[in-house]
């Protein structure tokens, strides 16, 4: 199992304090996954907390500037993953307590790329992060979907 997580990383290239996060964004790490059996994407929380721009729905012809916005970056992420791993099951884990704009964007973009969304609920948290109990609940909710 490979867990490829960076603390504070965003899907898009915009990070906290409007810093350039292209060195750690999800969209710039897709080539590092190797040959996975399954891909679980748990993102959007830091994009929301960093107040990254939402951007427009855009499904191709991305320019560098577009990827500093959440929607085009998520579309590029899923497009790249589908191209690199056409036979791998991909799931998006949608955290609870995000802005409706993020939730709706994730659902719409994931639908375009046929990526199931696992919407988390009732996750016990402390300072916005899952507690041990919350992580167990998260695991249970994800396993319930991927074991089908």
Q: Would you name each region that the model predicts?
A:
Residues 70, 74, 135:
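Aromatic/hydrophobic pocket-lining residues that form the small-molecule binding cavity
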Residues 1-59, 63, 129:
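Conserved SGNH/GDSL esterase-like catalytic core that processes O-acyl groups on lipids
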Residues 3-5, 94, 119-121:
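Residue-level recognition of beta-strand->loop/alpha-helix junctions
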Residues 42-52, 74-107:
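Active-site segments of SGNH/GDSL-like serine hydrolases
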Residues 126-148:
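Histidine-centered active-site loop/cap adjacent to the catalytic His
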Residues 1-2, 34-39, 85-90, 113-116:
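Loop/turn elements at helix/coil->beta-strand transitions in domains of secreted/extracellular proteins
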């Amino acid at each position: 199992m490979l867990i490829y997580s960076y603390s504070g990383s965003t899907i898009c290239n915009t990070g906290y304090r409007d810093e350039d996060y292209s060195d750690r964004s999800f969209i710039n790490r897709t080539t590092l996954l190797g040959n996975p059996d399954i891909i679980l994407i748990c993102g959007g929380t830091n994009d929301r907390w960093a107040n990254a721009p939402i951007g427009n729905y855009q499904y191709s012809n991305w320019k560098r500037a577009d990827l500093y916005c959440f929607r085009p970056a998520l579309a590029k992420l899923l497009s790249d993953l589908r191209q690199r791993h056409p036979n791998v099951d991909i799931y998006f884990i949608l955290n609870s307590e995000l802005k409706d704009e993020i939730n709706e964007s994730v659902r719409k973009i994931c639908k375009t790329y046929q990526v199931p969304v696992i919407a988390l609920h009732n996750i016990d948290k402390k300072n916005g992060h899952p507690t041990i109990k919350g992580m167990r609940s998260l695991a249970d909710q994800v396993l319930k979907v991927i074991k089908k």
